[in-house]
Amino acid sequence: MQVGINTAVYEDEVKAGASQLDCIKTLVGRNEIGAVEVRGEFFKPTTKDTELAAISQLCRDNHWDLYYSVPEELFGPNGYNASLQTNLDMATKYQIKSLKYSLGKVSLMSSSTLSQLRQLLMSSQTQVTIENQPNDNGQLGVVETALEWIKQQLLPLGYTFDSGNWYWIDQQPEPAFATLKSAITVFHLKDIKNQNTVMLGDGDTDWQQLLKALPNTTPIFIEYNIQSQNLPEQIALVQQALS
């Protein structure tokens, strides 16, 4: 099974001045990669469009699916984020398969606002997912309630399960996974020790069992800072767990 790479893997390189395009180019030739997820906050506004166009072409050339992490919340006091339309247009332009937002806080919405959101999501070919956050909006009970509400409102939203974010709100990923498993459409993988991200196998997460419990159609993204020399080993560990 192929593995996805979130560009959080290249945090050190990006902080040192590398572009996400530069980093992703290093994956060319790695047949075990099936998807790439770029991060909105890693782009420079002045070069974003040019870089994203090049990344999109690179993904097509290598038969990788392209995902995009939006550094914003989908839900808030005014209903849903007004950036959704703009980001869906961006996704269409650059052939982005999926947009990921943080959940935010679901508030009461008028029927017309709900209908507008539903139509916006249904009219797009791009999948939109919400993710559990490392704050009060990411508490298991809150996420469970939000996902049930999304289901009741017939909103075609997916759910990105982040296995690391639970630790930063003093919860555990394993019971959360058991509760939310049926809603998971994308999986963000990281291992945590003492609320710090570590290499796979060095933390407290039973990540192998979580991966084995996922349907084999669920995209799995490695999403933590990794020294470049350690990336092949980390990818191999994920593949081994999935084999």
What does each model-identified segment do?
Residues 42, 105, 134, 193, ...:
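Flexible, active-site-proximal loop/turn residues at the rims of small-molecule/cofactor binding pockets
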Residues 58-159, 168, 234:
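Active-site acidic/histidine proton-transfer and metal-coordination neighborhood
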